[in-house]
Amino acid sequence: MSRMYDRSEQLFAEAKTLIPGGVNSPVRAFKSVGRNPVFIERAEGAYLYDVDGNKYVDYVGSWGPMIVGHAHPEVSEALKAAIDRGTSYGAPTELESRLAKLILEAFPAMDMVRMVNSGTEATMSALRLARGYTGRSKIVKFEGCYHGHADSLLIKAGSGALTLGVPTSPGVPANIANNTITAPYNDLETLKAIFQEAGDDIAAIIIEGVPGNMGVVPPAPGYLQGVRELTRQYGALMIVDEVMSGFRVDFGGAQTLYGVEPDLTCLGKIIGGGLPVGAYGGKAEIMEKVSPAGPIYQAGTLSGNPLAMTAGIITLEILKRPGTYAALDEKAAYLADGLAKAAEKAGVPVWTNRVGSMLTGFFTDRPVVDFASACTSDTAAFGTYFRAMLDRGVYLACSQFEAAFLSLAMTKEDLDFTIAAAEEAFQVVAAERAKA
């Protein structure tokens, strides 16, 4: 292809001398797709523009937040006015209550919400609250579900449901890992066995509303309800991590879509309209344990800052408009169907999972229902596909195990452009496989 990436290559070489790995979040380095990253100069609507002048249809959307599109005029106008009033006060503002009201309106399971600065802060704080509220220490998480980089959540399972957790990163102490039990996702029977053995010690289950960091893997019918029943039976809390799915798959997130009421909910991404933000909330009797109302400490210098609150308010007000989610779902269904047909035409096996406007095409010929089945994907083939799509002006998540996100800014022309690019990219994959 005729695209050039010289300036991106220069900037990445420089960045590696200044920043670990040249990036401030590991996935951005493009390591798993066999090339160096492109450096972005600006974004508008459905598009990214890199420093070499290349334009891309963007399906990363800053890893989910940009659901209304980049530099949306209403969001940008409100932010410019907010900047002129000062960027941070370290004091309460009406904006915090306005955003809180919008969130509580969308999530009936929440009576109160606390703003923080990231999804990691939200999940970390929710776990501390769950432990403080229940007086228990252990938590259960699920294979393939990602909840940020807090120590107790960077854990993988050993061989067997109740094997002591093993850290997946150096620097996570064993005594912290020992309090995290990892279970297979979408497997209610194994979860029941875990609770039968350790239920009296479990403070909480934390689960993604729609897992997106092993690729998109929907919960099986009745699975979330089964998890909810187990936690109630044993007096543990159910924490639903909706950092990715909140306001994405439905205005009320996955819990509204699937009809489940958790004790605590974690949010992020979309509620900041592209600015750093997080939140956690739940029933008043639990949330009133958070300081200064209660004894469980949590704080943040920039929590509830006026810029993130402003962007979040405008974004959620846009999303509340009639027909928003029907339009997103229609676009995503059209794209998923077109991509599936393109893969079939090229003879490349791809299994597509989609929930609302988030989807993943797994390079495998079997259904993907959990982490183990996601891992049957041909990651080398995905890398070939990713590079071919990038060269054709389509910016995808640079990992097989991530979601593609659609935005309201995308047009049918953008989707058709993407499908046409995919038809060529799948042919490249097929040709590479034929050589092997």
Swiss-Prot record:
GO terms for biological process: chlorophyll biosynthetic process; protoporphyrinogen IX biosynthetic process. Its main location: cytoplasm. The modification N6-(pyridoxal phosphate)lysine is found at K269. It catalyses: (S)-4-amino-5-oxopentanoate = 5-aminolevulinate. Pathway: Porphyrin-containing compound metabolism; protoporphyrin-IX biosynthesis; 5-aminolevulinate from L-glutamyl-tRNA(Glu): step 2/2; Porphyrin-containing compound metabolism; chlorophyll biosynthesis. The keyword Cytoplasm applies. Keywords: Chlorophyll biosynthesis, Cytoplasm, Isomerase, Porphyrin biosynthesis, Pyridoxal phosphate. GO terms for molecular function: glutamate-1-semialdehyde 2,1-aminomutase activity; pyridoxal phosphate binding; transaminase activity. Gene3D superfamilies: Aspartate Aminotransferase, domain 1 (3.90.1150.10), Type I PLP-dependent aspartate aminotransferase-like (Major domain) (3.40.640.10). It holds the Pfam family Aminotran_3. It comes from the Bacteria. InterPro entries: 4pyrrol_synth_GluAld_NH2Trfase, Aminotrans_3, Aminotrans_3_PPA_site, PyrdxlP-dep_Trfase, PyrdxlP-dep_Trfase_major, PyrdxlP-dep_Trfase_small. It is found in: Cytoplasm. The keyword Isomerase applies. Coiled coil: none annotated. Its cofactor is pyridoxal 5'-phosphate. GO terms for cellular component: cytoplasm. Its EC number is 5.4.3.8. Belongs to the class-III pyridoxal-phosphate-dependent aminotransferase family. HemL subfamily. Homodimer. This is Glutamate-1-semialdehyde 2,1-aminomutase. It comes from Heliobacterium modesticaldum (strain ATCC 51547 / Ice1). The gene is hemL.
